From Swiss-Prot:
Record text on subunit structure and interactions: Monomer and homodimer. Part of the essential Sec protein translocation apparatus which comprises SecA, SecYEG and auxiliary proteins SecDF. Other proteins may also be involved.
Family classification: Belongs to the SecA family.
CDD domains named in the record: DEXDc_SecA, SF2_C_secA
Record's catalysed reaction(s): ATP + H2O + cellular proteinSide 1 = ADP + phosphate + cellular proteinSide 2
Lineage: Bacteria, Thermotogati, Thermotogota, Thermotogae, Thermotogales
Gene behind this protein: secA
Pfam families noted in UniProt: P-loop_SecA, SecA_DEAD, SecA_PP_bind, SecA_SW
Residues binding ATP, per UniProt: 80, 98-102, 537
EC number(s) stated in the UniProt entry for this protein: 7.4.2.8
Protein name: Protein translocase subunit SecA
Length: 871
C-alpha cells in the first residue's frame, strides 16, 4: 500500500507541472516556425547545468510538444509528459506497452541535451536505435540539435534533413503536419498535412564514430555504448577516443538491460594468433633450461624467474638480439609458460590427461573441471608438454558489466512496461525510484487465473486445443514460451493439427518487427520466446476488437513475475480489448523446484482427473508467492556479485585514469621519478631498514634492472636514506642519459611502452581475478564469507600488479637504446606486429572485423621505427 501512496504523491506533483506545461500550449501554437527555432536557441543559451534544466523544464517540454506536433503530427498526451518528467528526474518510468515511451523520451532528451554534454538513448537492438532516431529525428532537428546513431557493424550515422531547402521553405512559410484548425487528441494519417509531412523527412548520413558521439543526442545499443567505452581505454593516442564522457542516459527496456543483463560482462577478446607449433617449439626449448642456473622457481607465486644466464641462453636459442624488445614480449611469455608447465604443473596432481584433453583438477575438492582452462596461454603450454592437440587461446583485453558501465553516468533514467516488481533492486543498485505512469485510456484486458495440470504432456495438449478454438473464430493468439526448444515443440504440434502459424525466436533482426506487428491480425497465430519483439507494438487488425482482441497464452511461469507481466502486456494496448491466460504443469521447472508438491497434494485431495486442470485465485496467489521467493534469491545472488564487481570497478577506474594520465602527458619525468622512488624505496625498506642490512638480497631484488647499475664498489653507507639517495640517483642519471641519447622521439617511445605494459598486466590480472572469483565461492563451505575473501585477495593482487607495472616500466625505460640505420627496417617489421596485435584489442568479433576491414585507414607510425630495448 505504501508503494501506491508514494506513487500517488509523485503523480500529484507531476500533474501540477503538466498543468503549467498545458498553460503554455496556446502561446506555443501561435508562434511561427521561425519563433520556435529561435526560442530553442534562447533556451540553449540559458541551460548550462542540471539546475538550469530544472528551472526551464516547463518551457522546454512545451516547446518539444509543439515541435512534435508540427514535424510528426503527434502531440504527447499528459501521461507521456509525466513519463518525460520522471525520466528527467533520473527515475524509471513504468509505461505500459503502446503508451508511447519513444515520444515521451524526446522531452527529457531535448532538455538535457541543451547542457551540451551529450545524451545517450540506449535501446536493445540496432533496429530500434535506427528506427527511433529516424522517427524522432525531425523534432530534434527543428529545434537545432544534432542526432547521431551508432550500430554494431562499426558504422555511425547522423540524422539529417532529406531536402534542407524544402525544410527552409517549410520553416519560413509556417508549414505544420498538424493542421491549425484541428483540435482533437489524435491526428489520423489521412488528416495530416502531406506537404509538411513530406518536407520534414529525414535520412541517415554516414559519419565517424567520434562525430556520432559529438552529436547532442546519440542513439545506440547497450552493447555498443559499453564496447566503445572499453575500446576507448585501449587506444594508444588520446585523440582516438570516441566517447566524450557519461553525462545522461535514458535506457529503454530498462528492466532487461539494468537487471536481467546487469551481470552480463561485455568482453573485448580475440583469438590468439599463435600457431600450435609455437607452443610445441617452446615446450622443447624449456627442456634445455637448468633449474637454479637458468631460472629460479617461486613456489608461493607459482611463477618462474629467468636469471641473466637464462636470458642470454634464451636469446641464443630463440635467435633474437634482445628478449626485452617490445616485439619480443610474447616470446618471453611463451618461455615462462613452457617452464611453468614443465616444472610447476604436475600431471595427476594439477591436471589429468583424458581422451586427448588436459583437464584441470580442482585444488579444493579434487574433482575434475572439464571445460575449464588455464588462461594466458598456460593451458596450451601444458597441452604442448603432454603432446595432445592444442586448442586456440582466447585473450580477454577488457571487460565491464552493464551494471558498472551504466553507474558511471552522472544521471541515469529508464523506461519500460514492467519495473514495479523490481523497484527494490533499482533503488539499491542504481539509486533510481520507479514511477508507475497511468495509461492514457483505461486498461480493459481480461487476465484469467492460471490453469495447472499434472504433466507437461496434458498441458501442451490443452494449449493446442485452446489455440485451435480461438483460431477457428479468427481471434489472433500470441503464445509465449520460455525457450527455443519449447517453441519448436509447440510448432510441431500445431503443424500436425494443420494450424498455420509464425514462429519468432529471440534473434534480433529487422524481420522480427514485421512478424510481431502482424501478430494482431485476424486468424494469426504467433509463437514467440518471452523476450522476442520488445519495442514493437502489436496493433489489432480490422474486426479483431469485436472478437475479444489479442489472446496471450503463457506456457509456463517465469522465475520473475516481471517477465510474465511483459508477456501479458502484449495484449490490451491503448485501451484495446485483450485476454491473457497461463497454462502450467507440476513438471514445470518453477513448480518442480520451488513448491509444486503443495499443489500436487491439493490435486490429490480434490481427486482431479488426468487432463483436468485446477484453477483458483488462491492458486495464482500461491504461484506468485513462489515467484517472489525466487526473485529474492536471485536478487541476493546479483547483489553479492555486485559487491565483488565494485572492487574490480574501482581498480578498473584506477587503471583507466592512469592510462589517460599517460596519454595526455607530454613529459614523463615526474611520473617516472615517482616510479623510480617506488621501485627503490620498497626494496631499501625491505632489505636495509633495520640494523641487519642485506645488500646482496637488495641487489638480487633489483636484478630485473640493468646489472651494472648498482655496483657498490666497496662503498659504505651511513644510513638507509643515503643508500636510497645513491640508488635513486644512479637510476635517474641512467634515465637522463637514455633520454638524451634517443632525443625527441623518447617521450613517444616511453608512452607507447608504458601503455603496452599497463594493458598487458591488466589483461593478465583480469584472468587471475576470474580464478579467484571461482575459488572464493568454494570457501563458503569452510564458513568463510566469499565477498570478504574476494576483497582481501584482490586488494593484495592489485597492489602486487601495480608494483609489477612499476618494476616493468623501470626495467624497459632503462634498457631503451637507439638502433643504427641498417636495423631500421627490421625494427619497423617488429612494430608492424605490435600494431596489429593492438588493433586486435579494438575488435569485438570476426564479423565486425570484416565489416571494418574495407574502410579502415592505415594506422600512423607510433614513432618507434628507430627504437629497440637492450638488455
Amino acid at each position: 500500500m505504501l508503494f501506491f501512496d508514494k506513487n500517488k504523491r509523485i503523480l500529484k506533483r507531476y500533474s501540477k507541472i503538466v498543468e503549467k506545461i498545458n498553460q503554455l500550449d496556446q502561446s506555443m501554437r501561435k508562434k511561427s516556425n521561425e519563433e520556435i527555432v529561435s526560442l530553442s536557441s534562447e533556451l540553449k543559451e540559458r541551460v548550462n547545468s542540471l539546475e538550469d534544466a530544472d528551472r526551464n523544464l516547463v518551457e522546454a517540454f512545451a516547446l518539444v510538444r509543439e515541435a512534435a506536433r508540427r514535424t510528426l503530427g503527434m502531440r504527447p498526451f499528459d501521461v507521456q509528459v509525466m513519463g518525460g518528467i520522471a525520466l528527467h528526474e533520473g527515475k524509471v518510468a513504468e509505461m505500459k506497452t503502446g503508451e508511447g515511451k519513444t515520444l515521451a523520451a524526446t522531452m527529457p532528451v531535448y532538455l538535457n541535451a541543451l547542457i551540451g554534454k551529450g545524451v545517450h538513448v540506449v535501446t536493445v537492438n540496432d533496429y530500434l536505435a535506427r528506427r527511433d532516431a529516424l522517427w524522432m529525428g525531425p523534432v530534434y532537428l527543428l529545434l537545432g540539435l544534432r542526432v547521431g546513431v551508432i550500430n554494431s557493424l562499426g558504422k555511425s550515422y547522423e540524422v539529417v534533413w532529406k531536402d534542407p531547402s524544402l525544410v527552409e521553405k517549410a520553416i519560413k512559410e509556417n508549414w505544420s503536419v498538424w493542421p491549425q484548425e484541428f483540435d482533437g487528441e489524435i491526428l489520423k494519417e489521412e488528416q495530416m498535412n502531406k506537404e509538411a509531412l513530406n518536407a520534414f523527412q529525414v535520412e541517415l548520413k554516414e559519419i565517424s564514430r567520434k562525430e556520432a558521439y559529438m552529436c547532442d543526442v546519440t542513439y545506440g545499443t547497450n552493447n555498443e555504448f559499453g564496447f566503445d567505452y572499453l575500446r576507448d581505454n585501449l587506444v594508444l593516442d588520446y585523440n582516438d577516443k570516441v566517447q566524450r564522457g557519461h553525462f545522461y542516459a535514458i535506457v529503454d527496456e530498462a528492466d532487461s538491460v539494468l537487471i536481467d543483463e546487469a551481470r552480463t560482462p561485455l568482453i573485448i577478446s580475440g583469438p590468439s594468433k599463435e600457431s600450435p607449433s609455437t607452443y610445441r617449439r617452446f615446450a622443447q626449448i624449456a627442456k634445455k633450461f637448468v633449474k637454479d642456473k637458468d631460472f629460479t622457481i617461486d613456489e608461493k607465486a607459482r611463477t618462474v624467474i629467468l636469471t641473466e644466464e637464462g636470458v642470454a641462453k634464451a636469446e641464443k636459442i630463440i635467435g633474437v638480439d634482445n628478449l626485452y624488445e617490445p616485439g619480443n614480449v610474447s616470446l618471453l611469455y611463451h618461455l615462462i609458460n613452457a617452464l611453468k608447465a614443465l616444472h610447476l604443473f604436475k600431471k595427476d596432481v594439477d591436471y589429468v590427461v583424458m581422451n586427448g584433453e588436459v583437464i584441470i583438477v580442482d585444488e579444493f575438492t579434487g574433482r575434475l573441471l572439464p571445460g575449464r582452462r588455464y588462461s594466458g596461454g598456460l593451458h596450451q603450454a601444458i597441452e604442448a608438454k603432454e603432446g595432445v592437440p592444442i586448442k586456440e587461446e582466447s585473450i580477454t583485453y577488457a571487460t565491464i558489466t552493464f551494471q558498472n558501465y551504466f553507474r558511471m553516468y552522472e544521471k541515469l533514467a529508464g523506461m519500460t512496461g514492467t519495473a514495479k516488481t523490481e523497484e527494490n533492486e533499482f533503488v539499491q543498485v542504481y539509486g533510481m525510484e520507479v514511477v508507475v505512469i497511468p495509461t492514457h485510456r483505461p486498461m480493459i484486458r481480461k487476465d484469467h487465473d492460471d490453469l495447472v495440470f499434472r504433466t507437461q504432456k496434458e498441458k501442451y495438449e490443452k494449449i493446442v486445443e485452446e489455440i485451435e478454438k480461438r483460431y477457428k473464430k479468427g481471434q489472433p493468439v500470441l503464445v509465449g514460451t520460455t525457450s527455443i526448444e519449447k517453441s519448436e515443440l509447440l510448432s510441431s504440434m500445431l503443424k500436425k493439427k494443420g494450424i498455420p502459424h509464425q514462429v519468432l525466436n529471440a534473434k534480433h533482426h529487422e524481420k522480427e518487427a514485421e512478424i510481431v506487428a502482424k501478430a494482431g491480425q485476424k486468424g494469426m497465430v504467433t509463437i514467440a520466446t518471452n523476450m522476442a519483439g520488445r519495442g514493437t507494438d502489436i496493433k489489432l487488425g480490422p474486426g479483431v476488437a469485436e472478437l475479444g482482441g489479442l489472446c496471450v497464452i503463457g506456457t509456463e511461469r517465469h522465475e520473475s513475475r516481471r517477465i510474465d507481466n511483459q508477456l501479458r502486456g502484449r495484449a490490451g494496448r491503448q485501451g484495446d480489448p485483450g485476454e491473457s491466460i497461463f497454462f502450467l504443469s507440476l513438471e514445470d521447472d518453477l513448480l518442480r523446484i520451488f513448491g509444486g508438491e503443495q499443489i500436487g497434494k491439493v490435486m490429490k485431495i480434490l481427486k482431479i482427473e488426468e487432463g483436468q486442470p485446477i484453477q483458483h485465485p488462491m492458486l495464482s496467489k500461491l504461484i506468485e508467492n513462489i515467484q517472489k521467493k525466487v526473485e529474492g534469491i536471485n536478487f541476493s545472488i546479483r547483489k553479492s556479485l555486485m559487491e565483488m564487481d565494485e572492487v574490480l570497478d574501482k581498480q578498473r577506474s584506477t587503471i583507466y585514469s592512469l592510462r589517460d594520465q599517460i596519454l595526455l602527458e607530454k613529459d614523463y619525468d615526474e611520473y617516472l621519478k615517482q616510479i623510480f622512488e617506488d621501485v627503490i624505496g620498497t626494496r631499501v625498506e625491505e632489505f636495509c631498514s633495520g640494523k641487519n642490512w642485506d645488500l646482496e638480497g637488495l641487489k638480487n631484488s633489483l636484478s630485473f634492472l640493468p646489472r651494472d647499475l648498482f655496483e657498490f664498489d666497496g662503498r659504505r653507507f651511513e644510513s638507509s636514506e643515503e643508500l636510497y639517495e645513491y640508488l635513486f640517483n644512479r637510476m635517474w642519471e641512467e634515465y637522463q642519459k637514455k633520454r638524451q641519447e634517443i632525443g625527441e622521439e623518447y617521450s613517444k617511445v616511453i608512452r607507447f611502452l608504458m601503455l603496452r605494459i599497463i594493458d598487458e598486466h591488466w589483461r593478465r590480472y583480469l584472468e587471475e581475478v576470474e580464478h579467484v572469483r571461482e575459488a572464493v565461492q568454494l570457501r563458503a563451505y569452510g564458513q568463510k564469507d566469499p565477498i570478504v575473501e574476494f576483497k582481501k585477495e584482490t586488494y593484495l593482487m592489485f597492489d602486487e600488479m601495480m608494483r609489477r607495472i612499476n618494476d616493468t616500466i623501470a626495467n624497459y625505460v632503462l634498457r631503451v637504446v637507439k638502433v643504427t640505420e641498417k636495423d631500421e627496417k627490421e625494427a619497423k617489421e617488429e612494430l608492424g606486429k605490435i600494431r596489429l596485435v593492438h588493433e586486435e584489442f579494438n575488435l569485438v568479433n570476426r564479423a565486425m572485423r570484416r565489416a571494418m576491414e574495407k574502410g579502415k585507414k592505415k594506422g600512423g607510425s607510433h614513432g618507434l621505427g628507430k627504437i629497440r630495448v637492450k638488455r
